[in-house]
Amino acid sequence: MAVQLVPDSALGLLMMTEGRRCQVHLLDDRKLELLVQPKLLAKELLDLVASHFNLKEKEYFGIAFTDETGHLNWLQLDRRVLEHDFPKKSGPVVLYFCVRFYIESISYLKDNATIELFFLNAKSCIYKELIDVDSEVVFELASYILQEAKGDFSSNEVVRSDLKKLPALPTQALKEHPSLAYCEDRVIEHYKKLNGQTRGQAIVNYMSIVESLPTYGVHYYAVKDKQGIPWWLGLSYKGIFQYDYHDKVKPRKIFQWRQLENLYFREKKFSVEVHDPRRASVTRRTFGHSGIAVHTWYACPALIKSIWAMAISQHQFYLDRKQSKSKIHAARSLSEIAIDLTETGTLKTSKLANMGSKGKIISGSSGSLLSSGSQESDSSQSAKKDMLAALKSRQEALEETLRQRLEELKKLCLREAELTGKLPVEYPLDPGEEPPIVRRRIGTAFKLDEQKILPKGEEAELERLEREFAIQSQITEAARRLASDPNVSKKLKKQRKTSYLNALKKLQEIENAINENRIKSGKKPTQRASLIIDDGNIASEDSSLSDALVLEDEDSQVTSTISPLHSPHKGLPPRPPSHNRPPPPQSLEGLRQMHYHRNDYDKSPIKPKMWSESSLDEPYEKVKKRSSHSHSSSHKRFPSTGSCAEAGGGSNSLQNSPIRGLPHWNSQSSMPSTPDLRVRSPHYVHSTRSVDISPTRLHSLALHFRHRSSSLESQGKLLGSENDTGSPDFYTPRTRSSNGSDPMDDCSSCTSHSSSEHYYPAQMNANYSTLAEDSPSKARQRQRQRQRAAGALGSASSGSMPNLAARGGAGGAGGAGGGVYLHSQSQPSSQYRIKEYPLYIEGGATPVVVRSLESDQEGHYSVKAQFKTSNSYTAGGLFKESWRGGGGDEGDTGRLTPSRSQILRTPSLGREGAHDKGAGRAAVSDELRQWYQRSTASHKEHSRLSHTSSTSSDSGSQYSTSSQSTFVAHSRVTRMPQMCKATSAALPQSQRSSTPSSEIGATPPSSPHHILTWQTGEATENSPILDGSESPPHQSTDE
């Protein structure tokens, strides 16, 4: 690539072989003369011209030329310059450097040089009448041109002479107003209003008016339709528009790029395919979709080809902007742009000052097009950059100082608001920011009578005590206010309550001393401190020395006759009936007794209205048995209500208990009762979750839960609810084992929803709902966390059923209950083919465009980007593939129900079940049948073993638990034949197919009482965690 100067008398043949002279007209009316070599690309020529202005944003500009037919064409950047259809006449080829692609506003442009070139291009288009503008708008724009070039108004004569030199008034405006003086007067009238505006402001205001014109940024081409009616075809980055030949302002038809399918040209015909759902399929002459409408225009072949090339480039520019919207910088404000343009000066002054006057040809040599004054301009530019950097750093420092002052003002306003209870109006708020909610601080200030405070010489002892009493009473009142504040933390509330009690105690001591002196002097004692104490009793938690919580709303249910304990503080009266609890104990024994007094009843976290099958609140309204009850009742199989009441020390009576008429649940389990399984549909039956916990981990967890007095597992689990006769009759809502797979457990999941997993929820029964909204209390949340921990441990050690779930990835499938997590190896595409809108590739670096321009006679361009989508990921393909395994099985028609306690992450289960569906079902059915036979044969052995354990407190409690669990298993074993069949049919296909052969072949112990020992390797008597292992025979399958 080389640029050389040649004389004007060069031969035509020499031009074709060695190069051709070209003259580039710049936007500032200068001309750049070059010798273009045959191998020079149009893109390289554009780079050379752009470097003359130090232009960085070259994507908006292009180089145009006029062909032999007089139509304007553009150089295609990927082709060589001399390959274009230039006129064959001798002389240099005239090229025009101008804007090709327009945008909404100049605020999106980064460089000031680009903005100034857009301004020069707009002036040129208006002057050459490429943009239709009303004459009044022309006069206003001419005034801005004068303000930008000449500054403020000086005189009418100067303005009239300047208007003759500047390209301000187009010929069309002069035709509409034949009087030149009238046009000049109108311009002067607007010009006088612009006094004081800087050059940058004039440019910004000029561009704002031009950008609001409907014809700005549209390339117009004269075409005809099939009937020969002339039209204007407008092309821009927004789409293709059809205008009436006598009206370029209002389009008659609009075709946006997102609605277009293909662009064709063939000789004199240019066609577009548009999505039109209202169009009938018979109007489509070729094969394809039915909602496609074809629009065709006609012109000469050269113009048709030019229109087609411009349409392709505009669509590619549209795609580039659409795909790079995330990379587009934030728009600058117009005021900031005006300041920058004023400081940097004119473009021609900074770049072309040494090039000579306007109209002079700029010649280049040795391939360099930079002017001789470029070094000086570069040095000035570096100095300006340094100055701007210094100003920017100063601005940042001032902004930081302002931010600090605003923070200080906010703190002062908040302190004032805490004192007054109202936020001051001076509080600084950002746009759209809500004022903060301020809580008024508890006032503790007080004022005393000076006569009582100031001593008067030798004061008597009684006067001194009266003065101290007056001060201490005010201090006590202030401490009471602080202790009554409900918006502080629990720890701070305890500290304030302690301070309040100490103040009361000191006040009582002072009054006692006063009464002693009054009695000595023969006066009557007073009771002022007692009255203050009676009025100052505050409602607060009694668990200041214990972490076990009981909610305040449970007080209405406590009807036991607890004898009030006297307060250790002197002078404190007994609590009113609404606070019928003992105060914080001062000894360890008192703390232990208080724990069982306070936890008399636990309220169910489940609202009764959500359960229509049975009242599930009844198992929660139970009596907490004391630890001594475990020793006294270990020899009983099922302790009666009376024994339980006696174990409570006689302080609690159950005659008025809310559970008087119900079966007496003496269990520590807080799991809700199970509705009768005979009225539930088969698809709610689930298999046992397999949780891999090592024996060492189980032992450590067992020791941990053994020492927690409030834990579920430390008290054992008594699942029986029969009378003293031992009849196997059960209450209708039978209990479940809290093994963590209960779908009615609380809704918290032990795993989080990952972005790479897809959860397909199941169709839930109307009687089952989540419990998140029902129990917002922190106490109940902690209680449910302990239940979940116990449930997870119980499920790990649960041995009432053989482990039917595969370990590892699919091991948790059985425990997932309902709802399946599908971990997709490749995420489905987020794009979908929509009927009315084409599909574009958003993430690609460049738009995918199919172009077939092989000759000068015809061409085809696909507007819609080609995009192939896998069948598995289109319009629900992933859903169909996931659930394909259960399509042919009647038992699989029901959806899976999600487990509410612990959902394990599993791979896609539907695909596994599609291979060996029959074998998996048969294996599960056979395993269930073998387990049922072993359980039936060994039942009598469990009953015998349940009466031979030790009578110690620890082993006695465990023995009672195991014997009751054995009894429950025997009482429900009569329903096992039906449940085996229902379970086999209702198990999801994915769970049946995931049974490993190794676990099917393994033979677990026949005794459900020793399954925990078989799984964990621990002795049953050494592990108090038994609530999840002794479950009913069908428990593992229906949960």
UniProtKB/Swiss-Prot annotation:
The keyword Cytoplasm applies. Residues 366-386, 553-680, 713-756, 772-813, 879-968, 980-1039 are annotated as: Disordered. Residues 366-382, 788-800, 946-966 have a biased composition (Low complexity). Residues 912-929 have a biased composition (Basic and acidic residues). InterPro entries: Band_41_domain, CUPID, FERM/acyl-CoA-bd_prot_sf, FERM_2, FERM_central, FERM_CS, FERM_domain, FERM_N. Interacts (via coiled-coil domain) with CYTH1 (via coiled-coil domain). Interacts with PARD3 (via coiled-coil domain). Found in a complex with PARD3, CYTH1 and FRMD4A. Interacts with CYTH2. Interacts with CYTH3. Residues 358-420 are annotated as: Necessary for interaction with CYTH1. It holds the Pfam family FERM_C. Residues 571-586 have a biased composition (Pro residues). Residues 579-939 are annotated as: Necessary for tight junction and adherens junction localization. One of its GO terms (biological process) is establishment of epithelial cell polarity. Residues 382-416 form a coiled coil. The keyword RNA-binding does not apply. It is found in: Cytoplasm, Cytoskeleton; Cell junction, Adherens junction; Cell junction, Tight junction. This is FERM domain-containing protein 4A.
